[in-house]
C-alpha cells in the first residue's frame, strides 16, 4: 500500500513539471497539432492500432493536473475501512501544494456501534497557511464500495477521436474520486486568484458504511462553525441537488423450530413466517399513510423500500429454524421515528395474521431474543435533507441516495450547503462505473463557479 501511493505521488508530481509556472494548472488540451475538438494524428489512426491509441490517451491524462490527480487517486484501492493508502497519498500531494494538512484518526465500530480505538484510517483536513477556520469548505469522501476495479481508458470511436470522449473507468472514478480531484484543483485555482479568501478541504472516510468519518469531524474541534458555505461532492450529473431522501434501515430475524421436513407440523418454519412479513413490508411505500403505509411528498415522490438480503434454513429436508432479512428505506417525508413505528406495526400485524400467538419485539440484536420475531433498527436514521440550490446556471434536481450531509452538525446561522459533482449515480456502484474526460473537466468548472459564488458571499 505504502509503495503504491508513493509511486502514484512521484508520477503525478513529475507530470506537473510540464508547466510549473504557477500554482494554477493549465486545464486546456495538450496541443499536438490537431483541431480544437479532435487530434488529427489520432483521427488518422487505424482503429485496430490499440497500442498507439492507448499511448495517445495516456498523453491526454498526463498533460492535465486534474486528470493526472484523478488517475492517481483511482489507482489506489480504498474500499471502506481500508482508506489508509489513498489518505497517505492525498496528504503528501496537498503538502506538496503548500497546504497545511491535519490528519484526524477515525475509530472503527464494533457490532454495537461503539467506537474501537485505532490509528489506521483517517480524515484529511487541509487549508492554506494558518487559516484553520476558513469560510468556505469543499468536502468529499475517499472510500469506495467493493470490489476494486482497476483504472482504465477507452474510446467509443477511435477513428474519430475527441479527447473529451475518452472514457475513464474503474472503482471510484465517479463515486467519489471525481469530486475529490475536482475540489482540490478548484481550491488551488481559487487560492491563486484570491489568496485573501481562504478555503478548506475536508476528505473523509467511511461515507459508504455509516458515515463515521464525517461524524468524527463533526464532533471534533475542527468543526469550528466559522464557515458560511459547505460544498459537498457526490455524483449529481453536474446538477445542484435541492435535497435527498431520508434513511432508515432494519433487520428482521425470525426464530422458528426445527423438525424433519416430512413432519413439518412438529416444527415451525422461520422461512414460512418470514414470507408474509416481507410481502407486507414490500408494499409500505405503495399504500397511503391512512392504510398503514409510509409517507410520500411532492418534492421527493414516494418512500421506497429495498429488501436487499434474505437468508434462512440449512437444508430442504429441515424445517427452517432461523430466517433473516435486511431492508433499506428511503424516506420521502416524515420523521424517522414515526417511520419505525409504521414499520413495526406492519411487521407485527403480518406476523400475527399468519400465526395468532406470534410475538414481535424490537431488539438490539445482541441479547437473547424475547420474542419469536425480532425487529432490529439500524443506528443510522434521518429524515429528508433539504439543501441549497440557489446558484444560477445549474440544473436543479433531487436524489434518492444518502450522503454525509446529515452527519455534519452545523453551527451558526445562514450556512449554505450545496451538493454537486460530475458523473451519474446510475453507474456509481456498478461494474461499469465510469465518466468521460469531458464530464470530469466540466465538473471542475462547476466547482469553480460554486466557489466563486461563495467568495462573493464572504466579501459582502
UniProtKB/Swiss-Prot annotation:
GO biological process: proteolysis
Active site residues per record: 207 (proton acceptor)
GO (cellular component) term, any one: extracellular region
Necessary cofactors: Zn(2+)
Cleavable signal peptide: 1-22
Protein family (similarity comment): Belongs to the peptidase M20A family.
The name this protein goes by in its record: Probable carboxypeptidase TRV_02791
Annotated source species: Trichophyton verrucosum (strain HKI 0517)
Lineage, broadest ranks: Eukaryota, Fungi, Dikarya, Ascomycota, Pezizomycotina
Amino acid at each position: 500500500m505504502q509503495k503504491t501511493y508513493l509511486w502514484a505521488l512521484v508520477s503525478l508530481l513529475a507530470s506537473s513539471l510540464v508547466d510549473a509556472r504557477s500554482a494554477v494548472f493549465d486545464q486546456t488540451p495538450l496541443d499536438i497539432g490537431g483541431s480544437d475538438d479532435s487530434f488529427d494524428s489520432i483521427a488518422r489512426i487505424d482503429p485496430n492500432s490499440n497500442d498507439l491509441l492507448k499511448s495517445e490517451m495516456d498523453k491526454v491524462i498526463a498533460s492535465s493536473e486534474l486528470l493526472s490527480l484523478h488517475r492517481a487517486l483511482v489507482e489506489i484501492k480504498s474500499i471502506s475501512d481500508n482508506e489508509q493508502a489513498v489518505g497517505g497519498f492525498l496528504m503528501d500531494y496537498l503538502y506538496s501544494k503548500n497546504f497545511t494538512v491535519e490528519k484526524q484518526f477515525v475509530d472503527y465500530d464494533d457490532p454495537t456501534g461503539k467506537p474501537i480505538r485505532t490509528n489506521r484510517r483517517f480524515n484529511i483536513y487541509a487549508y492554506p497557511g494558518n487559516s484553520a477556520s476558513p469560510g468556505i469548505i469543499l468536502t468529499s469522501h475517499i472510500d469506495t464500495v467493493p470490489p476494486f476495479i482497476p483504472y482504465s481508458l477507452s474510446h467509443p470511436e477511435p477513428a474519430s477521436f475527441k479527447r473529451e470522449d475518452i472514457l475513464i473507468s474503474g472503482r471510484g472514478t465517479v463515486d467519489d474520486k471525481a469530486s475529490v480531484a475536482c475540489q482540490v484543483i478548484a481550491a488551488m485555482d481559487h487560492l491563486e486568484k484570491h489568496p485573501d479568501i481562504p478555503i478548506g478541504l475536508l476528505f473523509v472516510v467511511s461515507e459508504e458504511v455509516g458515515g463515521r468519518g464525517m461524524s468524527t469531524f463533526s464532533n471534533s474541534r475542527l468543526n469550528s462553525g466559522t464557515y458560511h458555505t459547505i460544498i459537498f461532492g457526490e455524483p449529481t450529473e453536474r446538477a445542484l441537488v435541492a435535497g435527498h431522501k431520508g434513511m432508515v434501515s432494519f433487520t428482521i430475524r425470525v426464530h422458528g423450530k426445527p423438525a424433519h421436513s416430512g413432519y413439518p407440523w412438529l416444527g415451525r418454519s422461520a422461512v414460512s413466517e418470514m414470507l408474509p412479513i416481507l410481502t407486507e413490508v414490500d408494499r409500505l411505500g405503495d399504500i397511503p399513510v391512512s392504510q398503514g403505509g409510509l409517507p410520500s411528498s411532492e418534492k421527493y415522490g414516494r418512500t421506497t423500500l429495498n429488501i436487499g438480503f434474505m437468508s434462512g434454513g440449512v437444508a430442504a429436508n429441515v424445517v427452517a429454524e432461523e430466517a433473516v432479512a435486511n431492508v433499506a428505506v428511503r424516506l420521502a417525508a416524515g420523521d424517522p421515528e414515526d417511520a419505525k413505528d409504521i414499520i413495526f406495526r406492519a411487521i407485527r400485524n403480518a406476523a400475527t395474521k399468519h400465526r395468532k400467538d406470534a410475538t414481535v419485539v424490537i431488539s438490539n440484536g445482541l441479547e437473547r431474543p424475547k420474542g419469536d420475531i425480532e425487529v432490529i433498527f439500524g443506528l443510522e436514521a434521518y429524515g429528508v435533507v433539504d439543501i441549497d440550490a440557489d446558484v444560477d446556471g445549474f440544473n436543479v434536481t433531487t436524489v434518492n441516495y444518502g450522503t454525509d450531509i446529515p452527519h455534519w452538525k452545523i453551527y451558526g446561522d445562514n450556512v449554505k450547503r450545496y451538493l454537486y459533482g460530475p458523473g451519474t449515480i446510475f453507474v456509481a456502484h456498478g461494474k461499469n462505473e465510469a465518466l468521460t474526460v469531458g464530464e470530469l473537466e466540466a465538473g471542475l468548472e462547476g466547482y469553480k463557479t460554486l466557489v466563486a459564488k461563495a467568495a462573493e458571499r464572504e466579501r459582502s
